């Protein structure tokens, strides 16, 4: 009877995927609870308000149309204020997000990349919200009863020059904003993109956490080293890996990362054992060759 051996790295990678999926589901549920916090509060009792406040009437009519018959419509307004549970738009949204979270967990169990799965889920959620929660048309909130007629006046020559300068500065600002941030800094300004990049780097490192890579030694030979021997947390390894040129760009595109180059770069800075064993001159050449080979794809 043959025995089935399971690679420990595969188990660690699966556990890391499940943890990320659970954190994603918890984050979605927390956002739903925060968005529904206003629905969980207790209504204000009118009898508990001061005596002057109970006489106020809230309506969209003009001040000239206010009358003293406030008692006839209080009962109907209370019924209209509260929304029935079947009409609450957040209930189907919560069910939809829970379904998305379950689907994410299933896809990650099959071995699909987190960056690809999360990008598709974000697009689906945006399309769902766009369809079911359309933006209301802009309404004029100006109160004509409180406005005063505008007085026309001619600006002085000095004011005209100042106005032209301010307009030109606004035009320059708008043109700079429309051109977008520089290409080298766009990834640092987008928190969601950074989270996806870090998740992709962590996923690939976790898959090969115990795999040993060959490095040149000081004794003109080679030695084997892996990420476990760094004795570092995965989050710290990811932070150091992002400092290596080209790694962030490869993770954004969902390509394979030069893990030996990452291990060499992190080990040469954070591991004394690695520093004592490695030939630093040959290490730099190997890291550069790995980067060039992976970036060529």
From Swiss-Prot:
Motif (Nuclear export signal): 49-58
Database matches in InterPro entries: PP_M1-like, PP_M1_C, RABV_P-like_C
One GO cellular component term: host cell cytoplasm
Any one Gene Ontology molecular-function term assigned to this protein's record: RNA-directed RNA polymerase activity
Biased composition (Polar residues): 168-179
SUPFAM superfamilies named in the record: Phosphoprotein M1, C-terminal domain (SSF118173)
Post-translational modification: Phosphorylated by host PKC and by an unknown kinase.
Motif (Nuclear localization signal): 211-214
Modified residues (Phosphoserine): 210, 271
Region Disordered, residue ranges: 140-191
GO biological process: symbiont-mediated suppression of host innate immune response; symbiont-mediated suppression of host JAK-STAT cascade via inhibition of STAT1 activity; symbiont-mediated suppression of host JAK-STAT cascade via inhibition of STAT2 activity; symbiont-mediated suppression of host type I interferon-mediated signaling pathway; viral transcription
Alphabetical UniProt keywords: Chaperone, Host cytoplasm, Host nucleus, Host-virus interaction, Inhibition of host innate immune response by virus, Inhibition of host interferon signaling pathway by virus, Inhibition of host STAT1 by virus, Inhibition of host STAT2 by virus, Interferon antiviral system evasion, Phosphoprotein, Viral immunoevasion, Viral RNA replication, Virion
Biased composition (Basic and acidic residues): 140-154
Family: Belongs to the lyssavirus protein P family.
Job description of the protein: Non catalytic polymerase cofactor and regulatory protein that plays a role in viral transcription and replication. Stabilizes the RNA polymerase L to the N-RNA template and binds the soluble protein N, preventing it from encapsidating non-genomic RNA. Also inhibits host IFN-alpha and IFN-beta signaling by binding and retaining phosphorylated STAT1 in the cytoplasm or by inhibiting the DNA binding of STAT1 in the nucleus.
Binding partners and assembly: Homotrimer when phosphorylated. This trimer is stabilized by binding to the L protein. Binds soluble protein N, and ribonucleocapsid. Interacts with host STAT1, STAT2, DYNLL1, DYNLL2 and PML.
UniProt name for this protein: Phosphoprotein
Species annotation: European bat lyssavirus 2 (strain Human/Scotland/RV1333/2002)
Organism phylogeny: Viruses, Riboviria, Orthornavirae, Negarnaviricota, Haploviricotina
